[in-house]
Amino acid sequence: MKKLLSIIALNLLAFNSFAVELKTTNPYPNLMPAQVTEKVNSMGVRKFIISTSPNVDGSTWDYILSHISSGNIEWLRIVPILSTGVDAGSAEDLSTAVATALPKNASGVLSVLNDSNVSISTESVCSLPFYQGTEAELNQYVIDSIRALYKNKGGGKCLQKLIETTGNSKSFSEGD
């Protein structure tokens, strides 16, 4: 009986440790854009971004970026707010997320670009800010983005940057 109780106690302790770890890596599960805005207003944008653990895989920051990457307009609308509190690493993350949304919602992406803010400038977002993916995936992204931008009246500057970057790039090699 004592052995059974000690096993149960250890299992509860292990589960509790797992739950605590889960909570520290994602303190805001199921976060919506309106809640992000509320948190930013109450905490300040920089403190909020720090609280999302931008350097931890599976964090709230990753959750936010995945929704921005989807091209959902509500998530894209909070990009200008978030961009004012990013550091170098999270700025790159944000640029990449916005760039990923480009072929999915070019109008939404173009509406949040701001050339006076490096992390969401045309230069950063429209110049293939990717470090991962295969050549086929990158090629498909370029084709889909060109199509999306070509169909959008305001897409000329981003389209020009995308084509310029593609034209100036060297051949792709996995593992570089």
Regions found by a protein language model. Name each.
Residues 2-8:
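Sec-dependent signal peptide recognition
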Residues 14-17:
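N-terminal signal peptide c-region/cleavage motif recognized by signal peptidases
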Residues 21-176:
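Non-catalytic all-alpha helical scaffold/repeat segments
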